[in-house]
Amino acid sequence: IPNTSNRVDFILTGEDENHHQNYVLVELKQWEKAEVTDIPQLVRTFVGGGYHNVDHPSRQAESYDLMMKSMNEGIYGNNIGGYPCAYLHNYEQKHPEPLLDDRYKDLVRQAPVYFQNDYGKLEETFRKYVGHGKGMAILYEIANGKIRPSKKLVECIDSLYQGNDDFILIDEQNVAYQTILKKSEDLDHKSTIIVKGGPGTGKS
């Protein structure tokens, strides 16, 4: 992901049946279960040796996709379409399934979640968007695309200075942001929240 230490897990490139250039961005998760939280866009699962609130996989995939579309000239300069999704290959879907809870429906609509037994659906997604060849040429454009903000991103930053909320937060940034918002809504008294992080991690 441009200007971050984050990496996309998996990308397939190719054309669809209408000869549009596309890529499918896949966020891979080894999770086996997850729980809903009362904090928007976040779920609770076992990572890093304990249970933590983290971005919903769909939200993570979509944020990575938005960053690439905003910063990679090979993508926005060639009108390459991006289709994010998440594949939880160790996760057997529950009924009801926490990750498909109504509170996450907008996220899942933007970036579908595929579970352990959904490999057929994932294959259909690949065939639909990138199953008609020319993948190497498209991958070359992405891999060699210059990292510079698109006009759309520049307009977005200008919009921020006008007081609008348009920023793309990824991973821990979004977890911190959503947690702070929830805390501020729940508290009925003045409070101080300290955000800890190294240089360039997005604290501001």
List the predicted regions and their residue ranges.
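Accessory nucleic-acid engagement/destabilization modules that flank
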Residues: 1-143
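General structural signal for secondary-structure boundaries
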Residues: 112-116, 150, 170
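Conserved ASCE P-loop NTPase core motifs with emphasis on AAA+ ATPases
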Residues: 140-158
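Short glycine/proline-rich turn/loop motifs
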Residues: 154-164, 189-190
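N-terminal pre-P-loop "Q-motif" helix
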Residues: 165-191
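Hydrophobic anchor at the beta1->P-loop junction of P-loop NTPases
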Residues: 195
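The conserved Walker
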Residues: 199
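Conserved lysine of the Walker
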Residues: 203
